[in-house]
C-alpha cells in the first residue's frame, strides 16, 4: 500500500493553489504530519484502518479537519484522498459536484470519517 509523503502533499498543495487560487503555506506542520500518519496508525500491533478505502477516508477527513494549511484544506483533503484511491487502483464514479459537496460537508462538520467511508464505497466502481 502506498503512503503519500509530506513533501508530495506540500507540492500538491502548491500546485492546487497555483491552479485554483488561494494562499500557499503550512499553518502547522505537526497537524499535516498527524493527518498523514493517522491513516497508518496501529493499536496493539493492529492497523486501525485496514483497507485502502478506510485509509483514504482517514486521509480525507484528517486533512480537511486538521486545517494544517492556511488555505485550501478542503481541496487538498479531497485531492489526496482521491489520489490515494487512484494510486491503489480504486476507480471512482463521482462528479465534481459530488467531490465539492464532500469537502464542504466535512469542513462544516456534517460528515465524519464513517460517512466519508460510506461515500467512497457508494461511488467506487
Describe each model-derived feature in a short phrase.
Residues 1-125:
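FIC/Doc superfamily catalytic core
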